[in-house]
């Protein structure tokens, strides 16, 4: 079998994150992700988000500025939705139900008028890592890449951030995200847990006040709070 190697200098990810994740990019599981990705592309299978946006969460959120991690599951699988940021959709795209509930909670919590745009890039640029546990999906097939190995990659990121940083906020919404709590050192970081914001989930997200709690914690550890208004 032909050996697959990865030239990390060609991976579209900022230098700070590239160095931070260098070891992960060389591990066997990541080589398998690359192999499956290339096989799908060669079969003309449509994958979301586009290749240049797969690592968008890292490219918009500088490693040295990271303050908050909001963990999603996998990208939106309909056309023009996925942009490499958990829960976010590009400007002029209809706001999905889960994001609608996030905006409702922002209004309840901080009196922020619900945004007309679902693009959360302004959060990312302030240090909010909008990380999906699975970073790609086949068009129209939810969770279709759940067996590729992406979870090992995102778990490694969470664990490494927990070990090497201090004073971070991890927002874990829904049982899938809550299961990642074991990767996080709760003596160094704030872990905020709630139900998933999806309207299909049981009640428990609306009223969680995670956005104000996160900002209070950031101020307590000497960091600038997040401006949650969508720009």
UniProtKB/Swiss-Prot annotation:
Its EC number is 3.2.2.27. It is an enzyme of class 3 (hydrolase). InterPro entries: UDG_fam1, Ura-DNA_Glyclase_AS, Uracil-DNA_glycosylase-like, Uracil-DNA_glycosylase-like_sf. Its main location: cytoplasm. The active site is at residue 74. Keywords: Cytoplasm, DNA damage, DNA repair, Hydrolase. One of its GO terms (biological process) is base-excision repair, AP site formation via deaminated base removal. GO terms for molecular function: uracil DNA N-glycosylase activity. The keyword DNA repair applies. The keyword RNA-binding does not apply. It is found in: Cytoplasm. It holds the Pfam family UDG. It catalyses: Hydrolyzes single-stranded DNA or mismatched double-stranded DNA and polynucleotides, releasing free uracil. One of its GO terms (cellular component) is cytoplasm. HAMAP family: UDG (MF_00148). Excises uracil residues from the DNA which can arise as a result of misincorporation of dUMP residues by DNA polymerase or due to deamination of cytosine. Belongs to the uracil-DNA glycosylase (UDG) superfamily. UNG family. This is Uracil-DNA glycosylase.
């Amino acid at each position: 079998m032909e050996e697959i190697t990865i030239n990390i200098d060609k991976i579209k990810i900022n230098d700070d994150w590239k160095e931070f994740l260098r070891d992960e990019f060389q591990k066997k599981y990541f080589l398998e992700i690359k192999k499956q990705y290339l096989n799908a592309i060669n079969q003309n299978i449509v994958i979301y988000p586009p290749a240049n946006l797969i690592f968008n969460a890292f490219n918009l959120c500088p490693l040295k500025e990271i303050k908050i991690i909001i963990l999603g599951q996998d990208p939106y699988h309909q056309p023009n939705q996925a942009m490499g940021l958990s829960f976010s959709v590009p400007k002029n795209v209809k706001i999905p139900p889960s994001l609608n509930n996030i905006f409702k909670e922002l209004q309840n919590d901080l009196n922020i008028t619900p945004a007309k745009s679902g693009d959360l890039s302004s959060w990312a640029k302030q240090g909010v890592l909008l990380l999906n546990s699975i970073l790609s999906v086949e068009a129209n097939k939810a969770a279709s890449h759940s067996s590729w190995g992406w979870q090992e990659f995102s778990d490694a990121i969470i664990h490494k951030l927990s070990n090497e940083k201090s004073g971070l906020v991890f927002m874990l919404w829904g049982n899938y995200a809550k299961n990642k709590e074991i990767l996080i050192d709760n003596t160094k970081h704030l872990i905020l847990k709630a139900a998933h914001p999806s309207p299909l989930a049981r009640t428990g997200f609306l009223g969680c006040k995670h956005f104000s709690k996160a900002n209070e914690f950031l101020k307590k550890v000497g960091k600038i709070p997040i401006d949650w208004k969508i720009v």
